[in-house]
């Protein structure tokens, strides 16, 4: 029997079958070993085949081919990956300029990974009602930067619902991953979009200006107007994986554009003579923050810095 994985609590997966039943399912032990290097071989959004047993639960026996997915390094194992979600129409990264701060390095790592796995991304800047003049200027700069690169951006105040109607229109009839740091307001947004779902919302640590985890598992939530939201635990750091050094610049759109003019085909854009990317940074044609994010991913390969909370 075929179905869609709509929830992952760690050891159990909820599979919604084609006839509308929700079946609690597990993976057989030997299934885990079949060329799967991720900590979670099955992800929310996967289409699977299950074998239902007499107790009413099931074993997952097959994962159908994915059209795409978003992946990051596992938080506890340096050589393993964690699949955040699969078979997405789009991802929305919830960003806050403050309360808590979302760094450009975090944003760019997420965008690069989405580019690598062909997942369209929109940036949604939340909590706009809380920003002072300095925060507002930073917000405007970020929107100008990412819009110029080609990423759609929007603003939102989940608390007052300003911008919520536009968000609903963007989500209609699509499977969307909602991601971002803990504390950026994902649970509040979902509570506004799906009345009655009653996700727990968390506070911001005043000492660290970071959010507390409120979502502890991944779940696909049906939207009233059609479509699904995939809610995942808030991410502190975003360690990239499965990218060869020579490919990383391909996932930074503006770097890739200028890299075609570099003197050497294998240019890493760090120090080589005749590097068009470095020249573009010096000329102000490529943002320094984006270039630093690119270098930080290269540094991952040499110094295993993925554990830092970017």
From Swiss-Prot:
GO terms for biological process: ribosomal small subunit biogenesis. It comes from the Bacteria. One of its GO terms (molecular function) is GTPase activity. The keyword Hydrolase applies. Residues 77-238 form the CP-type G domain. InterPro entries: G_CP_dom (IPR030378), NA-bd_OB-fold (IPR012340), P-loop_NTPase (IPR027417), Ribosome_biogen_GTPase_RsgA (IPR004881), RsgA_GTPase_dom (IPR010914), RsgA_N (IPR031944). Zn(2+) binds at residues 262, 267, 269, 275. Its cofactor is Zn(2+). GO terms for cellular component: cytoplasm. Keywords: Cytoplasm, GTP-binding, Hydrolase, Metal-binding, Nucleotide-binding, Ribosome biogenesis, RNA-binding, rRNA-binding, Zinc. GTP binds at residues 126-129, 180-188. Coiled coil: none annotated. Its EC number is 3.6.1.-. Pfam families: RsgA_GTPase, RsgA_N. It is found in: Cytoplasm. Binds 1 zinc ion per subunit. One of several proteins that assist in the late maturation steps of the functional core of the 30S ribosomal subunit. Helps release RbfA from mature subunits. May play a role in the assembly of ribosomal proteins into the subunit. Circularly permuted GTPase that catalyzes slow GTP hydrolysis, GTPase activity is stimulated by the 30S ribosomal subunit. Monomer. Associates with 30S ribosomal subunit, binds 16S rRNA. Belongs to the TRAFAC class YlqF/YawG GTPase family. RsgA subfamily. This is Small ribosomal subunit biogenesis GTPase RsgA. The gene is rsgA.
């Amino acid at each position: 029997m075929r179905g869609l994985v709509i929830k992952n609590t760690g050891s159990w997966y909820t599979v919604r079958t084609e006839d509308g039943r929700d079946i609690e399912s597990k993976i057989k032990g030997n299934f885990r070993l079949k060329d799967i290097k991720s900590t979670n071989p099955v992800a929310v959004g996967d289409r699977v085949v299950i074998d239902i047993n007499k107790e009413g639960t099931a074993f997952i026996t097959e994962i159908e081919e994915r059209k795409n997915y978003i992946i990051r390094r596992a938080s506890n194992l340096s050589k393993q990956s964690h699949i955040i979600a699969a078979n997405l129409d789009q991802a929305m990264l919830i960003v806050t300029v403050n309360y808590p701060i979302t760094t450009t390095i975090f944003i760019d790592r997420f965008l690069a990974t989405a580019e690598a796995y062909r997942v369209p991304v929109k940036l949604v800047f939340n909590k706009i009602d809380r920003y002072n003049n300095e925060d507002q200027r930073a917000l405007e700069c970020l929107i100008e930067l990412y819009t110029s690169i080609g990423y759609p951006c929007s603003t939102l105040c989940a608390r007052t619902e300003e911008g919520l109607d536009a968000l609903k229109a963007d989500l209609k009839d699509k499977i969307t991953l909602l991601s971002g740091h803990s504390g950026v307001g994902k649970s509040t947004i979902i509570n506004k979009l799906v009345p009655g779902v009653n996700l727990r919302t968390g506070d911001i640590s005043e000492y660290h200006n970071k959010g507390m985890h409120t979502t502890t598992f991944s779940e696909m939530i049906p939207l009233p107007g059609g479509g699904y939201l995939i809610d995942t635990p808030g991410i502190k750091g975003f360690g990239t994986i499965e990218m060869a050094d020579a490919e990383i610049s391909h996932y930074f759109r503006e770097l890739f554009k200028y890299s075609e003019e570099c003197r050497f085909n294998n240019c890493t854009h760090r120090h080589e003579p005749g590097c068009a990317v470095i020249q573009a940074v010096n000329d102000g044609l490529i943002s320094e923050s984006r270039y630093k994010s690119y270098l930080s991913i290269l540094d991952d390969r040499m110094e295993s810095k993925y554990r830092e909370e970017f």
